Amino acid sequence: MQQRSVMFRKRQISGKKGISGEEYQEMPFIRYIEKNQERTTMSEYITTYTGNHINPTNPNPALIRIEDIAHALSLLCRGNGHVKTFWSVGQHCICCAKEAMARGATARVVLACLLHDASECYMSDVPTPFKKKLPEYEIQEDRLLRMIFEKFLGSDLTKEELDLVKEIDHTMLLYDLKELLGEMTDEEMPKLHMELDYMVQPFREVEEEFLRIFTLYSRK
């Protein structure tokens, strides 16, 4: 409605004798309105690593790129940064994928483990206690993650696949709490099928390994 009003006003003014298009553009109220429109538009999207503009609440699947996911997750820290040393979401996802490999899981489950936190590169992570108070956030997060699975796996996860991904993710969480925070829970530590090493890798190496696993298992 605002844009139509501006265009109508533009025709009115520019049509008057003695008012050129250049003079119209320099009028203070026109500069203010058009600048405000630009800010409103920019506030509706984020700019990704590869230069795409994505609206996290209404994403276009065609703009979701694995390069953006791998890059962003390699730079995001687990636990909102409340860890003894830096540990990226990308490293966590790679470990989940490797645990799935070690268990002999299907290529789909390996990829799902790799991508299970992919929504965080567009929406950021929210601590679980706070997330429980934000039902709309959880709805949007679930919608975006389903879209990512459908794009890269061909379809959403089955219940059995989702249960296995959640189990592996929870197992890694328990080890993260122990190693990165020194925090133990009442749960018995589950068995790991992979060798877990919390050595921090350079961001670029994490990004490249993420992409290697994705490429390898996308072909299976």
Descriptions of predicted regions:
Residues 12-18, 22-26, 34-35:
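Charged/polar low-complexity intrinsically disordered segments
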Residues 3-4, 24:
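Cationic, low-complexity basic patches in intrinsically disordered or flexible, solvent-exposed regions
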Residues 11-17, 47, 77:
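Compositionally biased, low-complexity repeat tracts
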Residues 7-8, 22, 38-42:
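Extreme N-termini of proteins with methionine-enriched Sec-type signal peptides or N-terminal signal-anchor
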Residues 29-220:
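Metal-dependent phosphohydrolase cores
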